[in-house]
């Protein structure tokens, strides 16, 4: 069996980064913070995380990813990521109800990974031409063009979508943390919580008014 010692993983990161024992604060932009965050989200079968780990189970062609080890995100998910396993359990607990999933990041351990997690577990990227009732999601991050952002927000907030029939899940990055309102949301999941409670409340405020 494959056992993950997350404490050991993070200690190794700190050692590699030469972090001083008396250091009190760590910049959110530092590689230590990002690596620790990646490792806390998922550690892959080869005991890697972040970009290296992500690349071990996906191949990329252009802008599209292909999952080459599906078990990691499906049947074996709980072994490699209790966080993502719990997220999926909560989303699947109900057959309807709008969901907002927030990540600080886009690449590898962020919105890209959440998208692939949902695709591997029976959800579909929203398409007006090929709808999947209560099983569709959209990605609302820096890679989403402005026109599509406005369209997704309008559809998600429409009366017809109060229970998630058209778009059930929005996967959002920091561009959703201010000035945007998502209506009729029943679940809010923040993948990487901030130390600052006001920032967490700000994110929750996108969906709770």
Predicted regions and their residues:
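Helicase motor interdomain insertion/brace
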Residues: 1-184
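Short conserved active-site loop signatures built around small residues
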Residues: 188
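Conserved AAA+ ATPase "SRH/arginine-finger" region at the nucleotide-binding site
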Residues: 191-193
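Conserved SF2 helicase motif VI
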Residues: 196-209
